[in-house]
């Protein structure tokens, strides 16, 4: 019986080590870019229960300049409704983002203008090739003494030449 337990522990240890190898080997070199057009899907409400009730969510666009040396410029941050139309433009001019700095844009929980399947179009540029920014959406609701949160990541639609 003791031998069986020991072999089981060894198997678990080997499995854990192999998983570490898989995960540590999955790091990929990131290409540098001079600019991108990105789409970030966000969800301002989710259905729940048998009656298809909707739970409203606050949405935060989180944009982080990951380059430790170069600034980037945000040239477009538009909130896009479920119908594909621009609901709100957050920028009227270029907005600089220093190296390693972050910026947030918020859609309040009570704001229903985008519909359930809204999104953001984000465009940025840089004079020199840089690490692309990290662009994520965080959706949160804390109703009924329970927390609910979702995170989405942006998709690249186009690279600046």
Report each predicted region and the residues it spans.
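Bacterial N-terminal signal peptides
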Residues: 9-22
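Sec/Tat signal peptide C-region and signal peptidase I cleavage site
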Residues: 23-29
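A structural motif detector for short, solvent-exposed N-terminal "entry" segments of globular domains
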Residues: 32-56
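Short, solvent-exposed loop/turn segments enriched in Ser/Thr/Gly
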Residues: 53-60, 118
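Asparagine-centered strand-capping/turn motif at beta-strand->loop junctions
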Residues: 63-70
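Short, hydrophobic/aromatic beta-strand segments
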Residues: 70-77, 88-90, 132-134
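Intrinsically disordered, low-complexity Pro/Gly/Ser/Thr-rich segments with frequent PxxP/GP/PP motifs
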Residues: 81-119
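Terminal connector regions
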Residues: 111-161
